[in-house]
Every structure is written in C-alpha cells, then in structure tokens.
Design a protein with these regions (language model features):
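A short beta-strand segment in extracellular, disulfide-stabilized domains
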Residues: 49-60
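Solvent-exposed loop segments of extracellular immunoglobulin-like
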Residues: 62-70
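Structural motif
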Residues: 130-137, 174-178, 218-222, 260-263, ...
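Repeated scaffold domains used in trafficking and secretory/extracellular systems
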Residues: 153-163, 196-208, 238-250, 277-289, ...
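Bacterial Sec-dependent N-terminal signal peptides
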Residues: 1-8, 14-51, 103-122
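Surface-exposed, flexible coil segments in extracellular/virion-facing regions
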Residues: 69-87
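A short beta-strand motif characteristic of beta-propeller blades
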Residues: 142-152, 185-194, 228-237, 269-275, ...
Length: 436
C-alpha cells in the first residue's frame, strides 16, 4: 500500500513538472507569429493622383476561418475589403493602417506614404476665356508659374519650342509670337498679312531660317530672323476657311488642307502631290516610320517615302474626336510601342482614350475618362522623354464648369494612372501641352 501511494505521488510530481512545457508548446502553436505586408514599402513616395493598389498579404498558413479587414487612412476607416485602392488628393504624409480580425485575434499593420506633386516640366498653351488673349503657363517641379507669356492673340492654339525660343500661334492677331525661354519676354510677332478673316492654326519649324504658319487662308512661309511673314505656299491660292494641321518628315512637309493632304518637298517647299484620301485631323509618326491621320471612324496611314496611303476602318463604332472649329490634333503616337492613342467621341466630345496596336490592328480601351468629364483642346499629348501620356479633362457643362480642369498623367504602355495635376480655378481653356 505504501508503495502504491509512493508511485502515485511520484506520478503527480512528474505531471506538475511536465505541465508547463505542454502549456508552453500549446501557447506557441495557438499564437503564431503573423507577418502582414501591404504591397508597398513603408515610407514610399507616390505622386498626387497616382493609383496605388494595396493588398493584404498574411504570411501565416495557420490563419483559418473568416478574416475581417478594416483599412484606415490617417485614422479614418475607408474600406473593409482585402484590397484597397489608395490615391492621395494632395501632397503630404499619409498613415495607412490595416486591421485584421481572425478567430478573435487582432493583428495590425501600419505604413506611411509620402505624396508629392508629379515631378515633371512642361508648358500649357491656353486659348483664353471667351475672346480674350491666350497665355502660357509653366509647370515645373510640382509648382505652377502662371501667365509667363500673356500678350498673345485671342484663342491661342499651339506652342513650338525651337532652341532658346518658343513660337506661339493664336487664331487672332498677333498670329505668331516669338518669346525667349530664358525670361519669357516677347521678342517679335506677326500681326497681319493673313488675308480677309485669316486666323492662325499651327506652326512648323523647317530649318534655322524658315518656318511654316498654317492658317484658315492657307499656309505661309515665315522668316525666323527677323520674324516676318513670307509668301503663301503653292497650291494654296484659293484656300478659305480652312483648318490646317502640319507635320515635317525628312523629305516632305505634310499639310492637312481642305480635308486632304498636300505634300511639299522639304528642300525647296515646292508642291509635290495631293493625297486624295479624306482627312479631318493629323498627324502622328509611329515607330515603324508611318505617318498617320484620321477621319472620324477611319485611320489613314501614309508612307512618308513613297507617299502611298491606305485607310483602316475602326471597329465597334469607335469615332475619333474631331472638333468643328480648329484645335490641334489629339491623334498621338507612342514612343515605346508601335501604337496610336486617340479619344473616342460617342457624342460631341472626346471621352475615353483608346490605343491602336499597329502590328495587330487591335483597338483596346487605354484609359477611362473620369465621370462627367470630357477632353479639352488637343486632349492628348505624349511626353517625348519617357512616353507618359498627358490627358486634359474638363468638367462637362458650361460657365463655371470650365473652372474644373485637370491634367491626368498615365503610363504610356499600361494606361495606369500616375498622377493628377490640378489645373482648376481659372478659365484657362487649355489647348495643348508643350514639352521642352
């Protein structure tokens, strides 16, 4: 009997010694280390208006059952999904916190994101408000410098940078203004000579001495030094009420005139031929060396060497935006792919942006217009330095709606939104973006 009591006593003592280890082992299994990542590094820098996709990644296979999510931005709850799309509306530091509940356990992960203004540099040529002079604004290092050039004609259309100067075209006098980029002072201008009711359209530099000014009354030679209007190009004598785009290649000058294309030899600006295909906007030179224009639901491809052309019908009732009054063309070419960008115009305004793959001839939506907004001016420009696509959108409506204008910057390959640049607060009516 004593032996039995002794054995029970020993087993009891052994159980007391082993129990802490068993308890500790179970505790370790029930409370595993949970690692949470959000798909972006803590302290990352993004652009204002950049779309950031955050995804809850729980690096622990022991989490079972229902998982509840709660995303917070600067302490405010914003989503209960496993993924969250973040966009900074203004520059500053944002604290993003993800709270997770699983089997009554709570886990949390917080990171900081720094939002900056998009670090780009470009000029915007503004039409001006309701018959008032146009102007040029500059965006640089996240800051706007307004009306750096302002003594322009009414309804300015384009700005062409050449060396240390920028040439700005306006529909009304002065039709062409030459300004220094170093201090933005106007050094010369062309104020007359376009004929009855003549208006400026566009401008092209031919060489160090000569440019071409396209107008409603035909295309004129321009002497650059000093800035003076020369003679009208051949085969332009009877042109009236025209809308003229222009593009220079190595051997030829292409001018959209009277809804066709007139081709001039670049060496002496003599008339070469007319391409009879109907054209309503142009031009864009793609990576395969072809020159493109458009006519509503058709793209027109021209070989800039042989001058042969062909039409390509767009599918799915797509229509390229073409304004009834002259605006610079929004048909643009990618610098990284053999592709074109254009704004689809289901009604009267350009909205969503489409991308035409020249190799496959497939057309896909590239960027969806913001709700209740439409493109303005040329609407599309491609940054020649990095291939980003810049889109100008203005709120639909009249009057004060035009105060709400934004410039969207998207990746030229994927269409991913990289930034939104605020262009509100004034009746700018932006016509084009010009890169230096």
């Amino acid at each position: 009997m004593k032996k039995m009591k002794f054995l029970v006593s020993q087993l009891y003592m052994l159980a007391l010694l082993v129990l802490p280890f068993i308890s500790s082992s179970c505790s370790d299994d029930d409370d595993p280390k949970v690692e949470i990542t959000l798909g972006i590094e803590d302290g990352a820098t993004v652009n204002v208006g950049q779309i950031i996709q955050l995804e809850a990644q729980i690096n622990n296979t022991n989490t079972q059952g229902e998982i509840e999510y709660n995303w917070e931005v600067n302490g405010e709850s914003v989503s209960n999904e496993s993924n969250y799309t973040f966009m900074a509306n203004e520059k500053g530091t944002y604290t993003i916190t993800l709270n997770i509940i699983n089997n009554n356990d709570n886990f949390q992960k917080s990171i900081s994101i720094n939002a900056q203004m998009y670090p780009s540099s470009f000029y915007v040529v503004n039409e001006g408000k309701y018959g008032t002079p146009g102007s040029v604004n500059r965006y640089q290092k996240g800051e706007w410098n307004y009306k750096i050039i302002s003594e322009l004609g009414n309804t300015s259309t384009v700005g062409v940078v050449n060396g240390n100067y920028i040439y700005i075209v306006s529909k009304d006098s002065p039709f062409l203004v030459k300004a220094e980029l170093s201090n933005y002072s106007i050094v010369d201008k062309i104020e007359d000579g376009l004929g009855d009711n003549g208006q400026g359209n566009n401008f092209c530099i031919i060489n160090d001495q000569t440019g071409i000014l396209t107008t409603t009354n035909g295309a004129f030679k321009v002497n650059l030094n000093p800035l003076t209007l020369g003679e009208k190009l051949n085969d332009m004598d009877n042109v009236k009420n025209d809308k003229e785009d222009i593009y220079k290649t190595e051997n030829y000058l292409f001018i959209r005139s009277q809804e066709t294309v007139k081709v001039y030899n670049i060496n002496d600006l003599s008339f070469n031929k007319q391409i009879g295909t109907e054209i309503k906007t142009g031009f864009a030179l793609t990576k395969d060396g072809m020159l493109w224009a458009a006519n509503s639901n058709k793209l027109v491809k021209s070989n800039p060497n042989s001058l042969e052309s062909e039409e390509i019908q767009l599918p799915n009732n797509l229509k390229i935006f073409i304004d009834t009054t002259y605006k610079p063309s929004g048909l643009c070419a990618s610098i990284t792919e053999n592709a074109l960008y254009f704004a689809h115009a289901p009604n009267f305004n350009g909205t969503d942006i489409y991308k035409f793959d020249i190799t496959t001839q497939n057309v896909n939506k590239f960027f969806t217009a913001p709700t209740n907004y439409s493109g303005y001016g040329a609407g599309i420009q491609v940054n020649p330095q990095n291939g980003d696509v810049y889109l100008i959108y203005t709120e639909n409506g009249w009057g004060a709606h035009y105060l709400n204008t934004y410039i969207y910057v998207v990746d030229g390959v994927t269409g991913t939104q990289k930034a939104i640049i605020d262009y509100t607060g004034e009746y700018w009516f932006p016509s084009t973006i010009t890169f230096q």
